[in-house]
């Protein structure tokens, strides 16, 4: 799907400074001050328009959430949602996932969510997948020991390649489903893509993986 450019998006988000963090490097090691509490921080890498992260924030008010979305023209939809319905436990960043070490200290993030990431199906693009080993190393550097990644996708090949990459990295798998909606957990929060693919009859794959190093 072609991304529609919104030239006004960045200026709009900067006006919402209680939601959008324009320079998150200033908060490295100090996110508890930003949220004004010591609650755990969960991040979603590739938040899209924010259905998942805002849904999670409502369901778990005792957790702080940070939406990571590279594209300003997409992230602005999250900010707009929160202007209409404020959530004190969500912040939005427009940064590249490869730079997460610049914004979070080791152990400052309690969990990472990856939902319906770009599958980058061609072998020559494997390094761009958010479950490639270099990204796994980045997440490990901001998570605590035995930190977790929760991963959902509609793409079986991406799911299988992610299983292999995570296994080769030394991670263990605590929970897995090859058809999440066949027996959907009550606490599952769906993303925009999840709703769309489920309506088409496409199975949703999900796993929870833990670092063991």
From Swiss-Prot:
GO terms for molecular function: tRNA (guanine(46)-N7)-methyltransferase activity. Pfam families: Methyltransf_4 (PF02390). Pathway: tRNA modification; N(7)-methylguanine-tRNA biosynthesis. S-adenosyl-L-methionine binds at residues 44, 69, 96, 118. GO terms for cellular component: tRNA methyltransferase complex. Substrate binds at residues 122, 154, 191-194. It catalyses: guanosine(46) in tRNA + S-adenosyl-L-methionine = N(7)-methylguanosine(46) in tRNA + S-adenosyl-L-homocysteine. InterPro entries: SAM-dependent_MTases_sf, tRNA_(Gua-N-7)_MeTrfase_Trmb, tRNA_methyltr_TrmB_bact. The active site is at residue 118. It comes from the Bacteria. It is an enzyme of class 2 (transferase). Keywords: Methyltransferase, S-adenosyl-L-methionine, Transferase, tRNA processing. Its EC number is 2.1.1.33. NCBIfam families: PRK00121.2-2, tRNA (guanosine(46)-N7)-methyltransferase TrmB. Catalyzes the formation of N(7)-methylguanine at position 46 (m7G46) in tRNA. Belongs to the class I-like SAM-binding methyltransferase superfamily. TrmB family. This is tRNA (guanine-N(7)-)-methyltransferase. The lineage of its organism: Bacteria, Bacillati, Bacillota, Bacilli, Bacillales.
